[in-house]
């Protein structure tokens, strides 16, 4: 059966109640977007506005997706050889919006060109994870991280239907950028139990990623909100809600030293915790690069990071090495 027809059949069979929001984000033609929750979304928060796609604003050079209340996943099948490997993509946006192209579809284009199935998760925003309240100069930590629920659910669905979707249930990883990098760490350390009441058989499947990639992650360093004098005297402690163990999946980290949104301490704190726990971890730090560069080409050395990731994937995930 043709790959697209296979995904379409699975979508109709499993998510017959799906209907796209007229003004919300839609994938390009040929890609199937599916709701991940068959009925009511757990811990749903009423949104005063419908989902929308906004134009770039300020210094941002990419559009944003706002007010997501019905999370979805979109499949991007491999171009050419199917390695069986799958990567779920978590776009960034500070848990306030989603950078669905810069840190979403463009990432999927790169992954699928390397024989990897890509699943782009449109998780709930805003307020679905830790976020910075600029008006009141404070970081807000919601009681329930609904983005984590969406990530756990997606990994369970992929494993439940791995045979139908031609993916290896033991080669499912995650990649996230900025707030999405925090979501990578969250789902990598919160897989023993679901953070929502189980819905169906998919929630009996493991939601542990087999490998993880966090690119300029945020909300990981325990001391990021302290004053400068205190921060300079503190250690690289990880936030207590990110509990690294020896079972945390192998991880790839990347950050720039001049990142003025999420300081380099974010990756350093996570690296130290992973290293102490004996988790295989590779970290790349560059002097320059800033924040929010995605995979777009540039003149700085950090623009070559996808090559480093490709090498790491080839040595970490069996079957990817050409």
Language model region names:
Residues 264, 268-322:
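C-terminal catalytic histidine-bearing segment of alpha/beta-hydrolase fold enzymes
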Residues 23-81:
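N-terminal cap/lid segment of alpha/beta-hydrolase-fold proteins
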Residues 149-236, 240, 246:
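Primarily recognizes the serine-hydrolase "nucleophile elbow" in alpha/beta-hydrolase
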Residues 83-92:
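Short beta-strand element of the alpha/beta-hydrolase
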Residues 101-119:
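Short amphipathic alpha-helix adjacent to the substrate-entry channel of hydrolases
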Residues 94-103, 120-146, 188-192, 196, ...:
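Cap/lid segment of the alpha/beta-hydrolase catalytic domain
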Residues 91-96, 257:
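Active-site glycine-rich loops that stabilize anionic/oxyanionic intermediates
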Residues 253-255, 259:
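Short beta-strand/loop motif that positions the catalytic acidic residue
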């Amino acid at each position: 059966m043709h790959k697209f027809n296979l995904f379409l059949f699975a979508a109709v069979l499993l998510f017959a109640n799906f209907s796209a929001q007229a003004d919300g984000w839609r994938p390009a033609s040929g890609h199937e977007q599916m709701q991940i929750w068959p009925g009511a979304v757990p811990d749903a928060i009423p949104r005063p506005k419908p989902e929308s796609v906004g134009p770039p604003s300020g210094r941002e050079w990419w559009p944003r997706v706002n007010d997501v209340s019905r999370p979805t996943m979109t499949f991007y099948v491999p171009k050419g050889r199917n390695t069986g490997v799958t990567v779920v993509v978590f776009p960034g946006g500070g848990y306030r919006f989603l950078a669905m192209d810069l840190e979403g579809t463009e990432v999927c284009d790169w992954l699928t060109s390397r024989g990897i199935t890509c699943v782009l998760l449109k998780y709930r925003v805003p307020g679905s994870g830790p976020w910075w309240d600029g008006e009141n100069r404070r970081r807000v930590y919601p009681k329930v991280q609904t983005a984590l629920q969406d990530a756990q659910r997606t990994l369970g669905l992929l494993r439940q239907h791995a045979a139908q979707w031609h993916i290896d249930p033991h080669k499912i990883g995650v990649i996230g950028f900025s707030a999405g990098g925090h979501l990578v760490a969250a789902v990598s350390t919160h897989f023993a139990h679901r953070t929502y009441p189980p819905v169906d058989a998919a929630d009996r499947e493991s939601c542990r990623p087999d490998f993880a990639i966090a690119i300029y992650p945020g909300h990981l360093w325990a001391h990021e909100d302290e004053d400068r004098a205190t921060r300079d005297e503190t250690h690289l402690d990880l936030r207590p809600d990110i509990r690294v163990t020896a079972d945390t999946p192998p991880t790839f980290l990347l950050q720039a030293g001049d990142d003025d949104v999420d300081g380099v301490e974010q990756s350093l704190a996570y690296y130290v915790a992973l290293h102490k726990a004996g988790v295989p971890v590779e970290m790349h730090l560059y002097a320059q690069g800033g924040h929010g560069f995605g995979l777009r080409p540039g003149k700085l050395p950090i623009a070559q990071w996808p090559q480093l990731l490709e090498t790491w994937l080839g040595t970490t995930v069996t079957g990817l090495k050409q």
